[in-house]
Every structure is written in structure tokens, then in C-alpha cells.
């Protein structure tokens, strides 16, 4: 399995591995987690660790939104490449948004809702809808600090967010399709990076590169933080801008 940097990154730690999206690093994580005390590797052992933490962070469950949602699938084959999102991993964009929220909140996994409130014909509130915490991932804060810093570094390497006006943390992830179709573009992230208020996931089917997903995410953050006139964002036509990114 190749990394985008064919020369390799040398000896790096987790924060830089996230920043550089180093396939070698995370493949090695998957390999080592599949070893026993004698160093013998087991595909099933590696997958069981992946599935355990995927379950804790909610990736094996629907999100609770009030529309039809496909069931997620945590990879059950090809253990080592599964640690970089390959294998048989399959998730909806809403499930990845919940995943981003769990990271932003240092482990709080929510059941989501698309509804704010239910009112009567006079506007009186009959019921309010709030997301419910269904699990809290029990790992030490220094682990979350490493992840948060790594994701913050990712965004510093992507010029799509230059001059945004709010600090963002996130991760790109171009998904290969086949030789006949363009790749899917993906970005998950949250802002402000130091005190998150919003978490998002952007998927562009056959979007060629995650750089294009970053352009969309930049517009979304501009809109929700009211950083620019919405008419300059909601133009009613597709943007002609395209963007590439290397460290996916």
C-alpha cells in the first residue's frame, strides 16, 4: 500500500502522521494491533480492535435522523488497509458528521435529529428535540489532544481555508472508485478548532479530489459563522473553481 509521499515521511509521530495523512503509519498501526505477544499477526485480531473502537465512536450504528438512512458497515476484511478507510468500510455522510462531532467533543457520541421543535398552529412549542449522548469514548485526554492538533495541522496545509476568519480542524480523505470513474472527495471537520460549535462532513461523489470538498466546507463555515454575504455563497450555480490536495 503506497503513501502519497512515495519517498516516505521518515520517523514521525501521530500528530504529524495525521497532518501528512501517512498511509504507512496507519497501516503499521493496524499491523501492530493484530500481533500477539510473540509478534504473530492475525487478521481477525486486528479487525476486532478496529471494530471495537468503531463501535464505541458510533460508526456501527445509524445516527437517529428522521429520514431513511443506510446502515453503516465497519470493515470485516483486509485488516491493514482498513485502518486508512479501505477494506469494506461504508458510511453515510451523516454518520461521518456524527463521527466528526465525537472527535470535536473528545468522545461524546450523539443520536442526531433533524428537528428543532414541534409547534401547534399558534406557534406554541409542543416538543423540543435535542441530540442525546449515547456513549462517551473512554480514552485519555492526551489522545484527543494529539488527534485535535493533528487535524488542526491538516487544515493549515490546505489553502482552501486561507483567510476564512475562524480556525478549523479537519481531515480530508479522497476515496478511490475505479479506473473508469473519478474519485470521491471528502472532508470532515469542526470549528472553531479550540472551542468547537459546529462539526460537518462533506462528500462530493466523483468529486475528483478532496480539495473540492474543502472548498465546499469553507463556504459552509463562512455561511454558518456569517463571515460573508450569503448571496456570494448561495449563487444558484455550481462554482467553476476546482482545487487539488496532495496529502490525502
List where the protein language model places each region:
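Short, gly/Ser/Thr-rich active-site loops of penicillin-recognizing serine hydrolases
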Residues: 124-132, 218-248
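Short amphipathic alpha-helical face segments that pack within enzyme cores
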Residues: 92-98, 212-219
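Beta-lactam-recognizing serine transpeptidase/beta-lactamase-like catalytic domain environment
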Residues: 1-204, 247-248
